[in-house]
């Protein structure tokens, strides 16, 4: 799986729950909330003041190990 800024967080977590650590690191601790699971990575980054491109790159680097 390749992650983009348009990837829905819930879909990503369903495929690899270990990616939750990246969202916790940006202060997104409500991953079980239906609203957050429906957000894209870009939307979550906008709310949490984080660079979406950097987060996507970090997640993709992590996923390459699988």
Functional labels for PLM-detected ranges:
Residues 1-66:
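Domain-level signature for proteins that mediate thiol-based redox and metal-cofactor handling
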């Amino acid at each position: 799986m390749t992650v983009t800024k348009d990837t829905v967080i819930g879909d990503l977590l369903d495929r690899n729950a270990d990616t939750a650590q990246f969202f916790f690191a940006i202060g997104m601790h409500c991953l079980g909330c239906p609203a957050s699971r429906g957000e894209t990575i870009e939307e979550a980054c906008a709310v949490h003041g984080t660079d979406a491109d950097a987060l996507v790159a970090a997640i993709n680097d992590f996923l390459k190990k699988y």
